[in-house]
Regions:
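N-terminal basic/disordered segments at the start of proteins
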Residues: 1-19
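Structural motif
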Residues: 4-7, 29, 56-58, 129-133
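A short beta-strand-loop structural module common to alpha/beta enzyme folds
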Residues: 21-38, 154-156
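Glycine-rich, highly charged phosphate/nucleotide-binding loops
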Residues: 36-48
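Active-site glycine-rich loop that binds ribose-phosphate moieties when present
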Residues: 41, 104-116
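Hydrophobic/aromatic-rich structural module bridging two neighboring secondary-structure elements via a short loop
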Residues: 46-76
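Long, charge-dense
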Residues: 64-105
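Extended, histidine- and acidic-residue-enriched regions that form the cofactor-binding/catalytic faces
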Residues: 113-172
């Protein structure tokens, strides 16, 4: 079984189907990224005592004792081993699709748009790590970057990085 962040669950399911892995995937609400102290309890509840692999990077959560994805952030599984780039706000397909709900409303910017510049003042650009590029997602990525007041760069990454990391966890 894989307990996955909702931001990764669709990708995990698609990879499992493509690879023929018979694995149940249970998703945990992605909004918990805004409240990382609640992630462990949600993972434990979803796991229900079963032996699980956790499709979360660190994400600010204490997931000690679980086999999980390496790295500090889920975008690292799509970005690969590239160095962190100061000033970059990373977007994944999930964040592009759900930007208004998860980021804009999730951070209260719908009620207090004046906070945008405080929250994002240290960012110089948005980078969309595109797993599956479509015209609809292109438009949504442009919308997200515009709301942040940042120029957009697109890097087509696919999901191979996530697939390699899942394989290491599930097939070891």
């Amino acid at each position: 079984m894989v307990v996955a962040c909702g931001a990764l669950a669709l990708h995990v399911r698609a990879i499992a189907a493509r690879r023929g892995w018979e694995v149940e995937v249970r998703a945990v609400p992605p909004e918990l990224h805004n409240r990382p102290g609640r992630i462990r309890a949600a993972v434990e509840e979803a796991a229900a005592g079963d032996d699980v692999v956790v499709a979360y990077a660190h994400c600010g959560a204490d997931l000690a004792g679980y086999r999980r994805l390496p790295g500090a952030h889920c975008y690292e599984v799509f970005r690969g081993d590239a160095e962190d780039e100061p000033g970059v706000y990373y977007l994944t397909d999930f964040l592009v699709r759900s930007f208004d709900r998860v980021v804009w409303r999730g951070l209260g910017l719908d009620r207090h748009p004046e906070l945008r510049d405080d929250y994002f003042r240290h960012y110089t650009r948005a980078v969309w790590l595109a797993q599956e590029r479509t015209p609809e997602l292109d438009a949504a990525a442009e919308h997200a970057a515009a709301r942040l007041g940042l120029p957009l760069e697109v890097r087509e990454t696919g999901d191979a990085g996530l697939e390699r990391r899942l394989e290491a966890l599930l097939c070891s």
